[in-house]
Amino acid sequence: MSGLWAQVVTQYGTFKVEIIGSLAIQVLFWWVPSAGFVLLDRLAPSFAAKHKIQPAPKQPTSSEIFDAVLISFRNQLIITGLQVTPAILSTRSSAFQITPSLPSTKDFILHFLICLIAREILFYYAHRLLHLPYLYRRIHKIHHKFTAPVSFASQYAHPVEHIVANTIPIVLPPVLLQTHILTMWAFVSWQLIETATVHSGYDFFGGAAYRHDRHHERFNVHFGGMPWLDRLHGTDEIEGLVKKHN
């Protein structure tokens, strides 16, 4: 593994490794799972119906899902542009460590956990901010078009929201830590799978999707990806979760 990674970095250089690797992560851990969740209705209709959180009449139409795909693709192009431009204009090759050596196990675990906690804090308060009436009407309302969300809706957002709430909370912690790119990719992969899952509309993985589904349905509960800040601020709707899973 270490020999293969060293060969890739040496042969292709830091710029190509970062950009191509980051795009591959998006495809493998967001586009593929999101498509899988959306196609579940056709591939396993009885199973899908059993696990759908909201009833069929509330589900988005095919044209709405296609619109979510287009907007998500646009948002990813914007982020890729923001990632590529500084790398081209700056003399510094990358904000992350891209070295022939692998990250140590200690650094990998420590940076991953710090990024996980920091992302949750940044996302929760950015999300709460976007629910202020002025910002909600002008920016965040677009994302809430999907009152019964699907995975592709996780990146269906105003460009400002996609940068401030979806991207910065994930990217800023590893940038500040100067994390190894492999640790960064592992963290981003986790976040992409999580957001595809919680927007899937299915009751998988211990109620995570149910919490965010209720946020899209009610707007004023379950702002976080994890429940602990919602519990701290009284936005967790604990009674609803208990009834749902008992």
Curated annotation (Swiss-Prot):
<feature type="domain" description="Fatty acid hydroxylase">
    <location>
        <begin position="112"/>
        <end position="235"/>
    </location>
</feature>
<feature type="short sequence motif" description="Histidine box-1">
    <location>
        <begin position="127"/>
        <end position="131"/>
    </location>
</feature>
<keyword id="KW-0443">Lipid metabolism</keyword>
<dbReference type="GO" id="GO:0016126">
    <property type="term" value="P:sterol biosynthetic process"/>
</dbReference>
<comment type="similarity">
    <text>Belongs to the sterol desaturase family.</text>
</comment>
<keyword id="KW-0752">Steroid biosynthesis</keyword>
<keyword id="KW-0444">Lipid biosynthesis</keyword>
<keyword id="KW-1133">Transmembrane helix</keyword>
<comment type="function">
    <text>The third module or late pathway involves the ergosterol synthesis itself through consecutive reactions that mainly occur in the endoplasmic reticulum (ER) membrane.</text>
</comment>
<feature type="short sequence motif" description="Histidine box-3">
    <location>
        <begin position="210"/>
        <end position="216"/>
    </location>
</feature>
<feature type="short sequence motif" description="Histidine box-2">
    <location>
        <begin position="140"/>
        <end position="144"/>
    </location>
</feature>
<keyword id="KW-0753">Steroid metabolism</keyword>
<dbReference type="GO" id="GO:0016491">
    <property type="term" value="F:oxidoreductase activity"/>
</dbReference>
<comment type="subunit">
    <text>Heterotetramer of ERG25, ERG26, ERG27 and ERG28. ERG28 acts as a scaffold to tether ERG27 and other 4,4-demethylation-related enzymes, forming a demethylation enzyme complex, in the endoplasmic reticulum.</text>
</comment>
<dbReference type="InterPro" id="IPR006694">
    <property type="entry name" value="Fatty_acid_hydroxylase"/>
</dbReference>
<keyword id="KW-0256">Endoplasmic reticulum</keyword>
<feature type="transmembrane region" description="Helical">
    <location>
        <begin position="19"/>
        <end position="39"/>
    </location>
</feature>
<dbReference type="GO" id="GO:0005506">
    <property type="term" value="F:iron ion binding"/>
</dbReference>
<keyword id="KW-0520">NAD</keyword>
<dbReference type="Pfam" id="PF04116">
    <property type="entry name" value="FA_hydroxylase"/>
</dbReference>
<keyword id="KW-0812">Transmembrane</keyword>
<keyword id="KW-0756">Sterol biosynthesis</keyword>
<comment type="pathway">
    <text>Steroid metabolism; ergosterol biosynthesis.</text>
</comment>
<dbReference type="InterPro" id="IPR050307">
    <property type="entry name" value="Sterol_Desaturase_Related"/>
</dbReference>
<keyword id="KW-0472">Membrane</keyword>
<protein>
    <recommendedName>
        <fullName>C-4 methylsterol oxidase ERG25</fullName>
        <ecNumber>1.14.18.-</ecNumber>
    </recommendedName>
</protein>
<keyword id="KW-0560">Oxidoreductase</keyword>
<dbReference type="GO" id="GO:0005789">
    <property type="term" value="C:endoplasmic reticulum membrane"/>
</dbReference>
<keyword id="KW-1207">Sterol metabolism</keyword>
